Amino acid sequence: NSRILDIGSGTGRIVKLLKNKGLPAEGLELSSSMVSNAEKKFPDCTFKQGDATKAMTYAPNSFTHITCLYFTLYYIRDKEQFFHNCYDWLMPGGYLVINLVNRDQFDPILNTADPLVWVSAQKYAKERITSSVIKFKDFQYKANFTLDKPDDLATFTETMKDDKTGNVRQNIHHLFMPTQKHIISLAKNTGFILQGKVDLVNIQYEYQYLYILYKPN
C-alpha cells in the first residue's frame, strides 16, 4: 500500500491533488501558519507542522514515496541530514522525488512580469534577467534574485509598496543553493540510487528538473 509524504507542503495543493487521484498523501510543513491555512483550505487532507531535518519527525519505513518540490530543498541548510531522514522514513524500494534547478540559468522572474510568458524572455536577453517589477491594482511588487556562488547562497527579495499609504513590506528569502551535482552526490552518499531525471521545460520551467531517487530493497 502506498503512503506519500510531501515535504514543504505549503498551501497543501500537491497533497490535495494526490488525494483527488485516490493516493494516500500527507504534508509536512515547517510553518505553522501555512499548516493552518492548508487545513482550512483542505479539511479532508492531513498536514503536520514539523522539520524535515529532525529524524524523530516520523518513524523509519513509514512511506513508499516522498516528494520535495518547488524550492523547498533550497530552504534547507542541512541537506545531508534531509537525505538521511528521507532514506530512513522510506520503506525499502521507496522513491524520493526532488525538484532542483540549474542555479546559473533558471528563470527567477515571475510569469506576470515576463512579457513573453510562453516564450522565455531569458532567451532574448543579452544578460540573465534576475529582477522584476509588477504593477498590481493597489500596490507595486518588486522582486530581485542574487546568487553568491562561492558560498552557495542565494537571496530572493520581494518588496511590496502600497499605492495609497506608501507603506513598504519586504520579504527576504535565504536559499542554500549548491550545484545540482553536489546535491545529488549527497543523496548518493546516503544510499540513494538515481533512477531518472525529468526536464520541466515542457511546462514552462526552463532549467528546472525532477530527480527520481530510489532506496534499494
Segments the model singles out, each with a brief description of its role:
Residues S2-G8:
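Conserved class I S-adenosyl-L-methionine
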Residues T11-A55:
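Class I SAM-dependent methyltransferase SAM/SAH-binding core
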Residues T57-H65:
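A short acidic, Gly/Pro-enriched loop at the edge of an enzyme's catalytic core
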Residues T64-D78:
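A short SAM/SAH-binding and catalytic strip from SAM-dependent methyltransferases
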Residues E80-P92:
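A short glycine-rich, Lys/Arg-flanked "PGG" loop and its adjoining helix->strand segment in the class I
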Residues G94-L100:
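Conserved beta-strand signature within the Rossmann-like core of class I S-adenosyl-L-methionine
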Residues L100-K181:
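SAM-dependent methyltransferase
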Residues H174-N217:
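C-terminal lobe and adjacent flexible extensions of AdoMet/dcAdoMet transferase-like proteins
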